[in-house]
């Protein structure tokens, strides 16, 4: 196992040195399991990985905290020869498993969305200040290291304004030009192409996920408007200080992450003027999901069900809510 953020491994930050070191230490006649973390720090790492892939006695695992690992040349070299395993913070079910079997589920859910779904937070969750320090450090690492440094962004304050906008609008349809116009009207003038570049950097760093829109009747992707979701809703309190508000969109964020864990392509559905929160496509199969904090109100129930009822197919359709009525 080699972690390339460890100074002890600095001599191997060159693909030839890395390949020679690994090959020299392989056990002949046995399967060798190799784990490389943040290997993109190695100059020319693609060549080392490609050569190691050619060895019959090597099972290779490469981990990274952003999408740059599988971009460009490495994706071309390894096409069809790798399996991508996406990792997420804890699901609510996994979070519950850390608690006593008789824990109150509603209280656990409030804690889950207010504190964090990152595993380490479970060890420090009773110390609110330590949780905040941990999440702040995590956020700064992602934004400053993965985004600012890699994209060579000079206006960090503008980038953070975009981050705050996205965090404040999770679950809302966002159009690049509208984001630009809104921020400009608030005194932060920014061009549409800059907003687009910043959002691309943020989604590549996995702090946000983008979900494109899909015409459920015409069965085609729409070119404008996407929704954005945070990798962890607990980060909202670090980004913009919100606590306890907008619970409907927070629930939608939680559902999105759960669907992403289960695999498939995820879209925001559109049918006429109505919206379907999520359309999940897995091969030939589809499923449709509406998410609402509560549907005890008759008008709300009708509003949530009508788009599902208007879809002209027989794939499964679900309405997810926090209501616990029998």
Give a label for each model feature.
Residues 27-45:
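Conserved P-loop NTPase "ATPase switch" module shared by AAA+ and STAND
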């Amino acid at each position: 196992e080699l972690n390339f953020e460890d100074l002890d491994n600095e001599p191997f930050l060159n693909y030839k040195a890395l390949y020679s070191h690994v090959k020299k230490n392989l056990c002949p006649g046995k399967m060798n399991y190799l784990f490389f973390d943040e290997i993109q720090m190695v100059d020319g790492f693609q060549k080392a990985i490609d050569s190691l892939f050619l060895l019959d006695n090597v099972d290779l695992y490469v981990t990274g905290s952003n999408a740059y690992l599988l971009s460009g040349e490495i994706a071309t070299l390894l096409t069809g020869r790798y399996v991508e395993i996406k990792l997420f913070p804890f699901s609510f079910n996994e979070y519950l498993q850390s608690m006593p079997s008789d824990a109150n589920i509603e209280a656990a859910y409030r804690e889950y969305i207010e504190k964090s779904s990152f595993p380490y937070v479970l060890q420090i969750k009773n110390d609110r200040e330590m949780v905040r320090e941990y999440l702040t450090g995590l956020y700064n690492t992602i934004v400053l290291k993965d985004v600012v440094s890699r994209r060579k962004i000079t206006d960090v304050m503008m980038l953070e304004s975009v981050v705050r906008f996205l965090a404040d609008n999770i679950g809302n349809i966002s159009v690049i030009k509208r984001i630009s116009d809104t921020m400009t009207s608030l005194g932060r003038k920014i061009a549409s192409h800059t907003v687009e570049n910043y959002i691309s950097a943020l989604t590549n760093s996995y702090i946000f996920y983008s979900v494109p829109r899909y015409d459920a009747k015409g069965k085609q992707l729409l070119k404008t408007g996407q929704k954005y979701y945070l990798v962890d809703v607990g980060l909202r309190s670090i980004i913009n200080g919100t606590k306890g508000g907008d619970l409907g969109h927070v629930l939608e964020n939680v559902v999105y992450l759960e669907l992403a864990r289960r695999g498939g392509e995820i879209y925001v559905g559109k049918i006429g003027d109505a919206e379907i929160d999520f359309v999940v496509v897995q091969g030939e199969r589809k499923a449709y999901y509406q998410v609402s904090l509560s549907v005890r109100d008759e008008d709300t129930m009708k509003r949530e069900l009508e788009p599902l009822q208007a879809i002209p197919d027989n794939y499964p359709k679900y309405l997810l809510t926090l209501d616990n009525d029998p």
